[in-house]
Amino acid sequence: MSLKHFIQITKPGIIFGNVLSVAGGFFLASKGNIDFGVFLAAVIGTSLVVASGCVFNNCIDRDIDQRMERTRNRVLVQGLVSLKLALLYATILGVAGVALLYTEANPLAALFAVIGFVIYVGLYSLYLKRRSVHGTLVGSLSGAMPPVIGYCAVTNSFDFAALTLLVMFSLWQMPHSYAIAIFRFNDYRAAKIPVLPVKRGILVTKRHIMLYILAFLVATLMLTVGGYAGLNYLAVAAGMGMYWLYMAWKGYKAVDDTVWARKLFVFSIFTITALSVMMSVDFQVTKELLVTYAF
């Protein structure tokens, strides 16, 4: 047991991805008027809650991870950290994260962190992941919470932009997750996890991917239509979304579904990263805020 093992069970890669989306939501709401104290609270608080959820997920999925090639060497599967200690660690991380958001951001940001945690750990990890093909859809809601937390940390309100972020990031999760399920098909089948490719086939999954990317593309444009993001953001969102849709369409003619799915997965990360960056820098400044800057 070492510090490295405690870091590994928090899934740092997932935390980093969520930091980008928290920052995107925060800077979109800030419109250039940044409170760095609140920003740090939003980023660190969300990271702690996400880390907590990942540790709990590792605890819950020990039996599944034993049956999957890519996860059978995880820390808890190998017994490098005890279950009791991991559960205590996860609890401390979660409580600390929510407390930080509540005290240094606002109660609404903390509430969305709790909602995301409950969905991911309670609904998805404990129940739906093992029992329903719709587990991915429910789990996508938890993955969409970080940008909403970042946004609400600034505004302390759930408005059209916050709703758009929730819808955008939920829709993005679906083709992203389905791509993983395709190129990790054998692992999911061996672990008896009822993801869409395993339950209904890869062709059906490709159709779902197309529909979700199309819906995601439309949702991304709503930030500009609603007056929250600028035209540069719109251009990037439209371009990335349409190319992602084109890549999905090419899947119908793919010779190797595994190779195609990996490419689709990688581009999904590029897409959401680009949009998080663009909404951070190409926001719409209201007349009221311009007056604030002027004086």
Swiss-Prot record:
It is an enzyme of class 2 (transferase). Keywords: Cell inner membrane, Cell membrane, Heme biosynthesis, Membrane, Transferase, Transmembrane, Transmembrane helix. Coiled coil: none annotated. PROSITE patterns: UBIA (PS00943). GO terms for cellular component: plasma membrane. The keyword Nucleotide-binding does not apply. It is a multi-pass membrane protein. The chain crosses the membrane at residues 9-29, 36-56, 80-100, 108-128, 135-155, 163-183, 209-229, 230-250, 265-285. GO terms for molecular function: protoheme IX farnesyltransferase activity. The keyword Hydrolase does not apply. Converts heme B (protoheme IX) to heme O by substitution of the vinyl group on carbon 2 of heme B porphyrin ring with a hydroxyethyl farnesyl side group. Carbon 2 of the heme B porphyrin ring is defined according to the Fischer nomenclature. This is Protoheme IX farnesyltransferase. It comes from Pseudomonas savastanoi pv. phaseolicola (strain 1448A / Race 6). The gene is cyoE.
